[in-house]
UniProtKB/Swiss-Prot annotation:
Residues spanning the membrane: 36-56, 62-82, 88-108
Localization (cell): Cell inner membrane
Protein name: Probable 4-amino-4-deoxy-L-arabinose-phosphoundecaprenol flippase subunit ArnE
Record pathway: Bacterial outer membrane biogenesis; lipopolysaccharide biosynthesis
Family of the protein in this entry: Belongs to the ArnE family.
Superkingdom of the source species: Bacteria
Domain EamA: from-to ranges: 40-109
Subunit structure: Heterodimer of ArnE and ArnF.
Keyword DNA damage (UniProt): no
This protein's GO CC annotations: plasma membrane
UniProt organism field: Escherichia coli (strain K12)
Primary localization: membrane
Topology, Periplasmic side: 57-61, 109-111
Regions of this protein lying in the Cytoplasmic compartment: 1-35, 83-87
Length: 111
C-alpha cells in the first residue's frame, strides 16, 4: 500500500508541475488572469497533496530508498510533455529516461 502512496505522490507532484507549465501557455489577454489563477491554483493543490502523501511515505520507507523513486517524475514529465504539448524529445533524452527506469528497478528490487 505504501508503494502505491509513493507512486500517487509522484503523479501528483508531476501534475503540479504540468499545471505550472499550462499556466504559462498563451491565452487571449482578456482570459489570461483567470487562466493563470486556475492553473496555479491547481498546481498548489496537487503539490500540497503530494507533500502530505510524501510525508506518509517517509514515515514507512527509508529515505535512501524512497527519494530515488521520485526520479519517476522525470519519466512522467517527459511522457506528458510529448503527449500534451508535442514537445520534441531527443534520442539522448530517451536514453536518459531508460537509465532512470533501470535505476529505479535496481533500487526498488533491493527492498
Amino acid at each position: 500500500m505504501i508503494w502505491l502512496t509513493l507512486v500517487f505522490a509522484s503523479l501528483l507532484s508531476v501534475a503540479g508541475q504540468l499545471c505550472q507549465k499550462q499556466a504559462t501557455c498563451f491565452v487571449a489577454i482578456n482570459k489570461r488572469r483567470k487562466h493563470i489563477v486556475l492553473w496555479l491554483g491547481l498546481a498548489l493543490a496537487c503539490l500540497g497533496l503530494a507533500m502530505v502523501l510524501w510525508l506518509l511515505v517517509l514515515q514507512n520507507v527509508p529515505v535512501g530508498i524512497a527519494y530515488p523513486m521520485l526520479s519517476l517524475n522525470f519519466v512522467w514529465v517527459t511522457l506528458a510533455a510529448v503527449k500534451l504539448w508535442h514537445e520534441p524529445v531527443s534520442p539522448r533524452h530517451w536514453c536518459g529516461v531508460a537509465f532512470i527506469i533501470g535505476g529505479i528497478v535496481i533500487l526498488g528490487s533491493t527492498v
